[in-house]
Amino acid sequence: MRAVIAAGGTAGHINPALAIAQEIVKNEPQSKIIFIGREDGMEKRLVDQAGFELYPIEIHGFSRSFKPKEIIFNIKSVYCALKGSIIAGKLYREFKPDIVIGCGGYVSGPVVRKAAKMGIKTAIHEQNSFPGVTTKLLSKCADIIFAPNEDAAKLIGKPQKTYICGNPVREALFTANRESLRREWGISDKLCVVSFGGSLGARAINRICAQLMRSELDSGIRFHHIHATGQYGTELFSQLMGEMHIDKSNPDIEVYEYIKNMPECLAVADLVISRSGA
């Protein structure tokens, strides 16, 4: 199989797309898969890390404001969408995919629409209970729609071509060995907490987890806390740690913008704190 997969914006779109790609390759090892996304987006890092090729296009969302600055931004977004459609068409003519799959993010819009216009089979996967604007627009032209649950399927409103499949999960999340990893990381006798608020970050979770770290330190219990601040939470969390006199060099407190080895972290955790979402 030759497949093109479009996903971008947040890990909630990208990781399910990677799970789909990995399952395709697992079932058909000779398959060739190319991702489409932004060169400067999170998809570039995650797709490269997973060992797949990313074909870059520039794409932006649209603002719903009518302020002059936002109107100019929307004009630029239209231009990028048209340009992205042309670039996608060039890729399709060269690569000749059997199917194009959109997994969310603004990048999916022009990529899937162009494939449909060229007569290429298309599918879209929605990860959230409340389908996004891109999914609703693409539901008209996609051949197959995959939804996470009944509620999402009803909101999409295309029952004749919608299949409920849940959210694809990477196989690595089921294969990590808890006990060996805890020994390797030196935390066999410690309470391990893993916390994160999504790839962009969640202000409330960052505040609560900083308070929790302070409580863990004051309690005297043996603990190890791994926290991801998200893209927009790095400065805030650093500030919170300073305000609460949390030593950033403490080996039992690990703080990252994004947890790259999530399967291993989830395997060793005694408690996971996260936001809802894809």
Regions found by a protein language model. Name each.
Residues R2, I34, M42, E53, ...:
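Active-site-proximal region of nucleotide-activated glycan assembly enzymes
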Residues I87-V100, V107-A123, K136, K140-C141:
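Glycosyltransferases and closely related glycan-assembly transferases
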Residues G104-G105, G198, G230, S276-G277:
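Short glycine-/small-residue-rich Rossmann-like dinucleotide-binding loops
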Residues E28-P29, K90-D98, W185-S188, V268:
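Glycine-rich phosphate-binding loop signature in dinucleotide/nucleotide-binding domains
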